């Protein structure tokens, strides 16, 4: 019994000494990330959450690019090619959302993951509440933005975390 308590106390002591160092390292990383221009933050965020897709992720290649009909891209692309493809995709989407001004990059990143039509609507798909709020001039969008955290009808904690990180990195007050 005493051995278990000693081990527990030793583990606690190690945690108390190690975690502040890890926290300081994480803070330096966050400072570096926030020192980047917004587009670079968006690219870093997408790369982190999407990862480099392989053959099992077809029809997605690179960092989440969805192959379009007639496109002949291989999943065996280099990181540099995938980065270039990601940036080209983001620039195309930025044009679509430029009317939202300082929120255009945030909407671009969200649309890269969920699709433009989930936000803007198309046919029977209505505009999202997020876009409706922004169009009316209301920028209190945290709840609407983080509501895009469902996959196949189920809420995923990882997606909710991703939305919070995107907001923290890209939302301009």
Language model: regions and residue ranges:
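Long, amphipathic alpha-helical surface segments
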Residues: 2-5, 12-13, 23-53, 65, ...
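Short N-proximal segments of mature Sec-exported proteins
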Residues: 104-118
């Amino acid at each position: 019994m005493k051995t278990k308590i000693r081990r527990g106390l030793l583990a606690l002591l190690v945690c108390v000494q190690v975690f502040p160092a890890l926290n300081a390292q994480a803070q330096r990383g966050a400072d570096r990330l926030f020192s980047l221009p917004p587009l670079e933050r968006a690219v870093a965020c997408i790369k982190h959450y999407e990862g480099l897709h392989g053959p099992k992720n077809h029809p997605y290649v690179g960092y989440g690019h969805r192959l379009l009909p007639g496109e002949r891209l291989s999943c065996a692309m280099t990181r540099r090619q995938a980065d270039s493809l990601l940036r080209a995709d983001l620039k195309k989407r930025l044009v679509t959302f430029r009317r939202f001004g300082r929120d255009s990059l945030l909407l671009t990143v969200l649309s890269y993951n969920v699709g433009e039509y989930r936000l803007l609507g198309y046919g029977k798909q209505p505009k999202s509440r997020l876009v409706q709020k922004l169009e009316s001039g209301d920028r209190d969008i945290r709840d609407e933005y983080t509501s895009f955290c469902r996959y196949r009808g189920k809420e995923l904690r990882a997606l909710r975390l991703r939305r919070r990180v995107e907001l923290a990195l890209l939302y301009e007050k």
